[in-house]
Amino acid sequence: MSDSISVIREKLNQVTSEHDPFFRKCMQDERKGVEKLLETTRRKWEKEAQLRNKLEEMKQYETDLFQQGYKYIAGVDEVGRGPLAGPVVAAAVILPADFSVVGINDSKQLSEAKRDALFETIKKEAIAIGVGIIEHDVIDQVNIYEATKLAMREALDQLTPEPDFVLIDAMPLRYTEAELSLIKGDTKSISIAAASIIAKVTRDRLMQMYDEKYPGYDFANNMGYGTKKHLLGLDTIGICPIHRISFAPVKEAKLHFDSLK
């Protein structure tokens, strides 16, 4: 074969099967560079196949429900139960039956760049999206568990059309009789995974904004979780207006600084 390695690389990017005549022709090329390209191409196909299989697995709950006659299936998830500062955010997402974007998974398992890209894709292709945001002061009043349920209900209430079935990550909500709570649902249901991405990106962007407003806690990186830098900020600066007073490290910092007044 007279093609250069770079030309072969470009052509292989268009090939989708080992049965392709060009791929079979490359298999006769004894150059080490070509052999490496073929191996890289095979690995790429294998990864793509795994992603497609994962997509089909994650659509199984929705597929079964569509076959039962349900039309608008909402997935619900939350982010921000554990942080010491900021709101808890929930999202509810209704996806079309033919939604087939590969790569969607539990938002915590995705890179920030991948989450951001999928966030835009979901916003564009979803039938409906709702986002519930419950602030720190309400969390302190009702506790984080109840605040999380409030956020989920708020997200569901925003959906138009209304869902006729709800899939929820872990937490039983009793929003409707047609409801199923799934342990680790964000790794089992495409709708819940989509909701987890919407919720996380929304909350992360809020915390990045708060980092500019309340510097010294590293909110842009820790998103309000109790990291070393965050705890150092509490020790040296004290609390800020978005801290959750009912959470032990924040309560201790407040008591300490109040005692110095």
From Swiss-Prot:
UniProt-listed Enzyme Commission number(s): 3.1.26.4
Gene Ontology biological-process entries: DNA replication, removal of RNA primer; mismatch repair
InterPro entries: RNase_HII, RNase_HII/HIII, RNase_HII/HIII_dom, RNaseH-like_sf, RNaseH_sf
Localisation: Cytoplasm
A single GO cellular-component term on record: cytoplasm
RNase H type-2 domain: residues covered: 71-259
Alphabetized GO MF terms: manganese ion binding; RNA binding; RNA-DNA hybrid ribonuclease activity
Cofactor: Mn(2+); Mg(2+)
Residues bound to a divalent metal cation: 77-78, 169
Record field: catalytic activity: Endonucleolytic cleavage to 5'-phosphomonoester
Record-linked PROSITE patterns: RNASE_H_2 (PS51975)
Keyword Aminoacyl-tRNA synthetase (UniProt): no
Keyword tags: Cytoplasm, Endonuclease, Hydrolase, Manganese, Metal-binding, Nuclease
Name of one Pfam family that matches: RNase_HII
UniProt entry tagged with the keyword Transferase: no
Note on how the cofactor is bound: Manganese or magnesium. Binds 1 divalent metal ion per monomer in the absence of substrate. May bind a second metal ion after substrate binding.
NCBIfam families registered for this protein in UniProt: PRK00015.1-1, PRK00015.1-3
Main function: Endonuclease that specifically degrades the RNA of RNA-DNA hybrids.
Entry-linked PANTHER family: RIBONUCLEASE H2 SUBUNIT A, RIBONUCLEASE HII
Family: Belongs to the RNase HII family.
Protein name: Ribonuclease HII
Species for this entry: Listeria monocytogenes serotype 4b (strain CLIP80459)
Gene name of this polypeptide: rnhB
